[in-house]
Amino acid sequence: LKNLKSHFIKISLFLIVALLFSSCSENPSITGYNLLNPLDSLVVKRFDSTNDSAFTYHKELIQKDVLGGTRRILVGKYGDLTASSLIRFIIGLSSEMKDAVKNSNLIVNSARIKLNPVYKFGDTTSNNFNLQVKEIYTYFDEYKFTIDSLKSGRYEIINENIVVRNIDDDTLYYSELKPEKVLNWFKLIAADSSKKLQGVLLEPDDFTNYIRGFASSNAYYVGDPIVLEVVVTYNNKTDSLKYFVDADLHVIEKTSEINFDQTKLVLQSGVKQKAFVFFDISSVPKNAIVNSAYLRLYPDTLESKYGTSYQDSLFVQYITDSTNISIDSAVTFVLTKTSSGYYEGQLNYFVQKWIDNNSNKGLLISIKDPDGGVEKFVFYGTQSAIYSKRPQLIINYTYRK
C-alpha cells in the first residue's frame, strides 16, 4: 500500500511540473489555442461601420399608433405641431336631480374642467396659451382613436367653443364652461335620450404658441388629475358635484411632410416618428462569434428640441420585415446618453442573430417615451458630412480562419 501511495505521488508531481513547464512557454496564447489543430487559427477582429466603408442607410417613418392610456394628455400648438385631447367624463344624476331637471327646477350655477399642468414644449416664456372646449356626441374608443379618426368626419363634434374663460395659475388650469351647455347635458341624461354627451374635445386657440401636458387619468398622481366640477341649485339647496374621467387621450397633427434627408436622422415623440437604419455587415464572416456589438448615435444638439421633462433614451428593435417594418417585439435594447455626449447601447444578440440566420433586415429606432411629449431628437445621419458622427455600429468578433 505504501508503494502504491509513493507511485501516485510521483505521477502527480510529474503532471504538475509538466503543466507548469507548458504554461511558462515563451509564446503564451489565448486560452485553449494550443489545443487547436495546428492548421486552424482563431482571429479576433473589429468591424466599424464608419471606418470599414460599410453601406449604411436610414429613413424616417411615422407609425399611426393609438395614444390612449398615456400618463399625459397634450394640448397646444408649436411650429408644425397641433395637439388636441379628448376626455369622456362619467356623468350621472340622482333620481331627485333627474326629477328637478325634468321639472325645470335645477340651475347650473357654474361648471369648470380642472387640469393639472405637468409639461411644456415650445415657447414656454410666452403667455399665449388658451384652451377651447367643444362637445362630442359620438362614442370614441381611446385605444383605437388616432389623428385620422379626428379628421375622418365620422364623429359628431359641435364646432362651438363652450369656454367662458380660462384660469391659469401654473399649478392648476381651469376652463370655465357655459352653464347652459352643462344643463343641456343633464337634460339629455334625465330624458334618457339616445343622444348624450360622449366627451369633450380640448383644442388650442389660434394664438397659442406652445404645447402643454396635463396629468391624465392614467397618471400616478395624488388625487384626481382631471375633474369636471359643477355647482347646481335644485329643490332649494345648492350642491357641488364632481365628475371623474372614464377615458382620455391626445392626438397630434404634424403639418409638414417628412424630409428624407440622409444627412440627419430625426425622431419625434407624440407623432411617433421613428427611424429605420440598415448596416451592411456582409464583410463579417458567417462563422463569427460576436464578443460585443455597440450602436452609437451622435446628436445634433442645435437641431434637437426638448420639453420640460422627458426620458433621454431610445429603443432599438429587431426588424423582421423591412417592407412592412415588422419587428420582433420579444427583445428591445436601449440606447442611453453617455458622458461623451453620444447615445450607445449593446446589440450583441441582434448582431449574432443576423450572422447566424442571414437575416439582417435593419433596426427600428424610436424614442423610449413615445407619447409623453413631443421631443425632437435629431442625430447626424448616414450621409452626414461629418463622417465620424454618422450612425456607428461596432462589432468585436472572433472567427476560425
Report residues per predicted region.
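Secreted, disulfide-rich extracellular signaling modules
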Residues: 2-15, 19-401
